[in-house]
Amino acid sequence: MSEMASDEEENIIPFQLQFDKPIPFQIKIAEWNPEKDLLAMVTEDSKILLHRFNWQRLWTISPGKPVTSLCWRPDGKAIAVGLEDGTISLHDVENGKLLRNLKPHDVAVVCLNWEEDGQSNTDESGNFSVYEDRTSRFFPPAPRPPKMPGLVAGDSSFMDDGEDSLAELSNTSFRKFNILCTGDRDGNICFSIFGIFQIGKINIHELSLPVPHLDEHASCKLFNASIYKVALSKDLCRLVVMCTGELKDCDIKPREEKINVQDLPGLHCLAMDTSIFWKRKYELHQVAQQASNIEDLTEVIRASLSVMNKQWADAMKTFHEKFHSLSTLIIDNGLESSPQEEFLSLLGGARISPALNQFLVNSLGEVGVKRVLKSVCGTGKELQQVVLDHLQPAAEIIGFRIGELRGLSRWRARYQGIGLDEMLLNEATENTGLLLVQVQRFMMVLSSVVQQFSNFFNWLVRSIKYLMQEPNDQLLSYNSELLVVFLKFLYDQDPVKDLLELSEAGDDIEIDLKTIGRVKELLQFGGFSECDFLQRTLAKEFQHMESSFKMAFQMPFTTISRKISCMKLLPLCPLQLSTTQTPTTIPMSLSFYKNELSDDTPCQSGYTDYISFQVPDETFPEISNCIGIAKGYKQNSNNEKNGYTSLEAVLLSVPNGYTCVDLSLYKDKELVLLLNKTNTDSEGSGEACMMVVQTGDLAFISISGSSSLNQWELEDLKGSIVNLEMENEKVRKVPHSVIAPLAVSASRGVACVFAERRRALVYILEEDEDEEISDEK
């Protein structure tokens, strides 16, 4: 019986294989949804796919540019995609619809990490603290960008389903505070609240890297640095950055008896102090909520102006094309008059010229007049509708929201520390009011112009009827005075176009002295401090307002950026120039685990960061085919200002005959390794295995006292390498040679492995529920 039992135990295969299916393309990036059994993948030709756990494909999209990174929003409802040109695209999980494009970088976005606040929404006093957005009390739902006329369904980027998703993306009132971290190829790291409002930026080349164990005031710089991975802790207090580069400008004289790490390319780990995000998360939440909604509404105004400009330009093009032939006929008949003079002559009762008669009766005709009338006056009504439904409501809500921010800025004790500047917000608030005045003026000008065009066309119809000796008693009447004004000032002028376009320097709108005097009188009664704003066009005023917003929002961005600093540098190992592994091919994984003895005090002892990576071959002669794991534990931020109280690491030797393809930190401090067998027959499909290592059982060695710029961190571990044995770990054989990436979901307990021969294998990493229940009992 005992022999049979032992045989059964040996036959138990860990990690149930869900399926092994062929795929038509090779995958370069794969990430599981944190909340659902959904897998997002990026193909080698940069198509983004979303599959269910059963491998049913939900959608495929192509951004049109090379995809370099991908991550999920913490709630699993959106995907952030980093592109080679520095763009970050946010897509809806339901249909892949593009929600937002951001451009915080100028070069390829190589890594993304989106983390939300792990704490409950309570303030320092323990009171429930969720910021209430009061806008919905006073305003209807925010307007959407108008559709460009003439587009069929599917052509516009403002589709209904996408608009609903975008509204949800911006509605952050009851969502947990979260931050998207993005790193690019040039060493820039950007921080965006809710993934849409940029709140900070640092460059690892410009950081002062502390070395307090040698000299309290010493620091150094990284040169030729490249970021590989970033990870933000769940309390938002710490950012871990894996990067490569050369340490220079160090003020410490190296010890001659040890290897100097300066001027050598190496793999480094930086621990950044981002505690400002936790300390001021409620204030930042409020600012980001208002500012991101203002930015959305600004885009509504921009789209409205663009649509209006195009519509009016098309209508005026139709008008001028129809009436251009009159000028040609006047010249052909040897006349020296202008079209306006010909029309005024006809209006005055003079004999009609042959040119004008030919134009009205033969070229234009009653049908032509009505067609132009419909185009111009119909467009005028459409423009009025765009203003009433989109532009004006957006400007009014912006005015309310910027006023809310101005009110917050007066609470200096809480908001001055994050850069909310009252003076800049006062200016932005006034500029919003100026835009609303410009909108009212535009509506008055548009109404007047449309009325005069309509009056002109009514007169033309009556004139054509008269010339053709047809009855015209039933036709609309016209106003002769308005007609004279139109022919003198509007026939070859376009005040609507002037207001919709940006004015050049020196092309300001002329304002009479009486109007300027009224504006100055209003100043004495608390009116606008600027008196010359009416000389600007509507488009110019919008640009002026947008510029003031950027200045006001730049202050929190700059302030927060300055408060992010480096508190620890770990020079892990050198990188030989001759190595076959580039930084982008070194398997790495970063994660944070909650401490068991934590008292839930953020920024002190809440989370331990784990860093796992494959040690590149040729790094050290004594270390080959090894996996490095380091963990940092910051016990008390008050006592240890610039570092951790504990830094530990361990080296794992990969079993003989295997090489590491990829790795991923898993839940409960576990590490999943994907290993390829080295002695595979070239004719076969190869063989690999997936191994789960319990990091909690490993003998970590403290390296906090040995950190020095004269020695690489891994050198202390050469004599204490832990050998991984296949029989001692959970191992699942894979009947294929495998390639990166290894996609592991800690929340769902699944892993996806990709084979060289284009196959996808999905495994369930969790044990049977029956076993778990029995264990609990």
Curated annotation (Swiss-Prot):
Pathway assigned in UniProt: Protein modification; protein ubiquitination
GO cellular component: anaphase-promoting complex; nucleus
First and last residues of every WD repeat: 22-62, 63-103, 105-141
Biological process according to GO: anaphase-promoting complex-dependent catabolic process; cell division; embryo development ending in seed dormancy; plant ovule development; protein ubiquitination
Keywords, comma-separated and alphabetical: Cell cycle, Cell division, Mitosis, Nucleus, Repeat, Ubl conjugation pathway, WD repeat
SMART domains with a match to the protein in the record: WD40
Subcellular location: Nucleus
Domain of life, per lineage: Eukaryota
Record has Repeat as a keyword: yes
Gene3D superfamilies (alphabetical): YVTN repeat-like/Quinoprotein amine dehydrogenase
InterPro entries: APC4 (IPR024789), Apc4-like_WD40_dom (IPR024977), APC4_long_dom (IPR024790), WD40/YVTN_repeat-like_dom_sf (IPR015943), WD40_repeat_dom_sf (IPR036322), WD40_rpt (IPR001680)
Main function: Component of the anaphase promoting complex/cyclosome (APC/C), a cell cycle-regulated E3 ubiquitin-protein ligase complex that controls progression through mitosis and the G1 phase of the cell cycle. The APC/C complex controls several key steps in the cell cycle by mediating ubiquitination and subsequent degradation of target proteins such as cyclins. The APC/C complex is required for the female gametophyte development and is involved in several aspect of development by controlling cell division and cell elongation. Involved in the control of endoreduplication.
Family, per entry: Belongs to the APC4 family.
PANTHER family tied to this protein: ANAPHASE PROMOTING COMPLEX SUBUNIT 4 APC4, ANAPHASE-PROMOTING COMPLEX SUBUNIT 4
Assembly: The APC/C is composed of at least 10 subunits.
Protein name, per record: Anaphase-promoting complex subunit 4
